[in-house]
Design a protein with these regions (language model features):
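Active-site-proximal beta-strand/loop segments in catalytic clefts of secreted hydrolases
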Residues: 1-5, 12-16, 42-46, 79-83, ...
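Mid-domain, small-residue-enriched loop/turn segments at the edges of structured enzyme/sensor domains
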Residues: 14-75
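Catalytic cores of large soluble enzymes that bind and process phosphate-bearing ligands
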Residues: 4, 19, 23, 157
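Domain-terminus/edge residues, biased toward the C-terminal soluble/receptor-binding domains
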Residues: 36, 54-265
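Cell-wall glycan
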Residues: 2, 32, 99
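Short alpha-helical patches at coil-to-helix transitions and adjacent helical residues
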Residues: 2-9, 56-60
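Short glycine-/small-residue-rich flexible loop motifs, especially phosphate/cofactor-binding loops
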Residues: 10, 28, 119
Length: 265
């Protein structure tokens, strides 16, 4: 990943999928599972020449969905944050192989640090003649982890645009923990259908967050409770909208308290 070694992409594809074709199908299946609607992979490395030019494509939104899923993987996070790496001598190569991350936002690769960004924690560069310079990055500040996707950029716009977008978001938006700020649920001011939230057996999952403009109050976010994605522990879901946009949510979960009966309205 650090050096964009396409031959390694083929090796991974054959190791994981058995064949390159099977692995590419796995890639497309995973993209569909993540909710991608404008993506189709035709190879494991990303180059799109010849036949691949029409069969291998994606968009910024879909790539952000894929990046979000990838960032959940601890090994991926470690690799994408690595600035330099040394491969020791092997039976095929008797010298150390030095690798450098091409992401100028975390490592001064060619630009002498001109585009280093203190909040960037990883990312991946790309380039094809059709897509021009592309860049997916991750940045963390004030408990927020953001993903930025830039495509069809004329260098150095992939760096400058990413930094400008991150700065705008960090300066104008804040993260709110739902469990710490939501009072309408326990006060009975939220339409929850049949679930009786006055019960001591339910609570809001503390992992849930929403993002709002710094000029807005948490109470201005409109909640909606659904039962679409439930499990043994997740009893319901709250999603919030602000100015017509989904801004995050949280699960309503069981407190783990055992009872002979469970309270519903």
């Amino acid at each position: 990943m650090l050096e964009s070694a396409n031959e390694c992409a083929y090796a991974v594809a054959e190791h994981v999928g058995g064949t390159v074709e099977n692995f590419v199908q796995m890639m497309n299946d995973k993209a569909a599972e993540l909710g991608c609607v404008n993506t189709h992979f035709n190879n494991p490395h990303g180059l799109s020449e010849g036949e691949d030019a029409t069969l291998h494509y994606t968009c910024c939104y879909d790539m952000a969905l894929i990046a979000k899923a990838a960032y959940q993987n601890e090994t991926f996070r470690a690799i994408t944050a690595t600035k330099t790496y040394q491969i020791p001598p092997t039976n095929k190569h008797d010298e150390i192989t030095y690798l450098q991350n091409h992401n100028e936002m975390i490592h001064a690769f060619k630009t002498r640090g001109q585009y280093l960004y203190e909040y960037c924690v990883g990312g991946k560069t790309g380039y094809t003649t059709a897509a021009n310079s592309t860049l997916v990055t991750f940045a963390e500040k004030d408990d927020m982890t953001l993903i930025c996707v830039i495509m069809n950029a004329q260098s150095p716009a992939q760096w400058t645009d990413s930094i400008a977008l991150y700065n705008y978001y960090f300066e104008n938006f804040s993260l709110y923990n739902v469990a710490q700020n939501e009072t309408r649920l326990e006060n009975g001011e939220m339409d929850t259908g049949m679930l009786n939230t006055n019960s001591s057996f339910v609570k809001i999952d503390p992992a849930g967050n929403i993002v709002l403009p710094k000029s807005a109050e948490f109470s201005e976010a409109a909640p909606a409770v659904s039962y679409d994605n439930t499990s043994d522990d997740v009893l319901a879901n709250i999603r919030y909208t602000f100015a017509g946009h989904d801004v995050g949510g949280a699960d309503i979960v069981s407190t783990g308290v055992k009872a002979d009966t469970f309270s519903f309205d």
